[in-house]
Amino acid sequence: MSKLEELDIVSNNILILKKFYTNDEWKNKLDSLIDRIIKAKKIFIFGVGRSGYIGRCFAMRLMHLGFKSYFVGETTTPSYEKDDLLILISGSGRTESVLTVAKKAKNINNNIIAIVCECGNVVEFADLTIPLEVKKSKYLPMGTTFEETALIFLDLVIAEIMKRLNLDESEIIKRHCNLL
């Protein structure tokens, strides 16, 4: 496979995100995700490995916009309660620790969103599933294409929240770390 073919795979995965603007079913999923974020008392995000890094990026951006957002497992993460939202990120949808968190959260409320590549067991606990159906590549190992697409998708979500709430970059700058 040539470098150009690899780039085409990445480009096509990004183009998959167009469906959130061109297909009513996908527009509704995006709107539901954004509505739930805006209405949640607190937002909890969890993923493992590189999906976890993507989750941390998303939690940080939500905090920059003024939301109470937390990455599950950090020492400063508060308890999950009935008015909260849990967003799970898992390429396989079968990661054991993600399933454990989903099971515990389901006993507290039904406000769980799963962002996945493959619809594994985690979707049984989610009341909204967003499958990012990306193409895999021989030279972009394991979940690379999912992780890249998830990062771009979640940045798209941030942009949509900013539009909906009429926020601009100055809101982010106000909450950006200023001690380093």
Swiss-Prot record:
Residues 33-167 form the SIS domain. Keywords: Carbohydrate metabolism, Isomerase. It holds the Pfam family SIS. Its EC number is 5.3.1.27. Substrate binds at S51, S90, G91, S92, G93, R94, T95. SUPFAM superfamilies: SIS domain. This is 3-hexulose-6-phosphate isomerase. Catalyzes the isomerization between 3-hexulose 6-phosphate and fructose 6-phosphate. The gene is phi. Belongs to the SIS family. PHI subfamily. It catalyses: D-arabino-hex-3-ulose 6-phosphate = beta-D-fructose 6-phosphate. PROSITE patterns: SIS. The active site is at E147. Homotetramer. It is an enzyme of class 5 (isomerase). The lineage of its organism: Archaea, Methanobacteriati, Methanobacteriota, Methanomada group, Methanococci. GO terms for molecular function: 6-phospho-3-hexuloisomerase activity; carbohydrate derivative binding. Pathway: Carbohydrate biosynthesis; D-ribose 5-phosphate biosynthesis. NCBIfam families: RuMP_HxlB. One of its GO terms (biological process) is carbohydrate derivative metabolic process.
